[in-house]
């Protein structure tokens, strides 16, 4: 269960340090790409911590301000991944991920060259010199950070989470291959953008069959890949979603999240 912010700097981070959420989504998909603000936000989390669970900061996953529509876009903008991870966040999420080559570049941009080799992805692209700030945010040495800052579950000891939004009809065509790239850690299906892509409406609480089929395909792809599926949750459907196997709930809020935790008998450390 996560909380989302669409912008914010030091003060906003400090206020969210004691969040109810399991992690924070810092959404730059439709917001300014401001690394000064993001670094301030992360420092605010440190200064407002530790968390209720005793961690230095909450986990933060940043939504990138690019769409993964093809390889050219990814090669032209992979530097954004390095900048974002260099701010000390713990993961990145890519919108409109259309194809396994896009996923591969995203994973490579999230790793260091000396990270453990793996079939299906090439050498990491993160460079030396950018690890100092992120290491301080994590509270570790530069060397320790470089060992920890690798993609899970490709590296079982990695603490970087890389996610995909399979959220249009073009991305759906290669959903299985995209989420199956080693280093991808979770995926979602993006009902809003998928509705626009198919030019259908979800008004009145009814989901058109084409959307239900899209959701089912992405969900099945994550199951095959052995990674979590993210879906919207509310008070009316949270138990159903949990029973179905949804692992990450969006839009839940504190009360709904607590209800889900109680349903799964999950005891929080506070």
Regions from the language model: what does each represent?
Residues 1-270:
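Expand to "…catalyze enediolate/carbanion chemistry for C-C bond making/breaking, isomerization
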């Amino acid at each position: 269960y996560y909380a989302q912010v669409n912008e914010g700097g030091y003060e906003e981070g400090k206020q969210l340090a004691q969040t109810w959420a399991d992690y924070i989504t810092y959404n730059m998909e439709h917001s300014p790409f401001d690394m000064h603000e993001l670094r301030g936000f992360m420092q605010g989390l440190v200064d407002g911590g530790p968390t209720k669970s005793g961690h230095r900061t909450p986990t933060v996953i940043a939504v990138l301000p690019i769409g993964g529509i093809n390889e050219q876009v990814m090669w032209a903008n992979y530097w954004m991944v390095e900048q974002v991870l260099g701010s000390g966040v713990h993961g990145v999420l890519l919108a409109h991920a259309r194809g396994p080559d896009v996923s591969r570049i995203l994973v490579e941009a999230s790793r260091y060259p000396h990270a453990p080799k793996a079939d299906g992805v090439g050498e990491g692209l993160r460079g030396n010199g950018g690890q100092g700030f992120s290491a301080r945010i994590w509270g570790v040495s530069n060397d320790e950070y470089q060992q920890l800052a690798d993609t899970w579950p490709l590296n079982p000891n990695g603490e970087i989470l890389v996610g995909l939004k399979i959220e249009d009809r073009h991305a759906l065509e290669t959903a299985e291959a995209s989420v199956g790239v080693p280093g991808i850690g979770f995926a979602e299906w993006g009902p809003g953008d998928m509705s626009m892509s198919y030019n259908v409406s979800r008004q009145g609480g009814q989901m058109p069959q084409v959307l239900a089929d899209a959701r089912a395909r992405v969900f099945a792809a994550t199951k095959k890949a052995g990674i979590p599926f993210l879906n919207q949750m509310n008070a009316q459907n949270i138990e159903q979603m949990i029973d179905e196997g949804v692992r990450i709930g969006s839009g839940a809020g504190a009360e709904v999240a607590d209800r889900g935790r109680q349903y799964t008998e999950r005891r929080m450390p506070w």
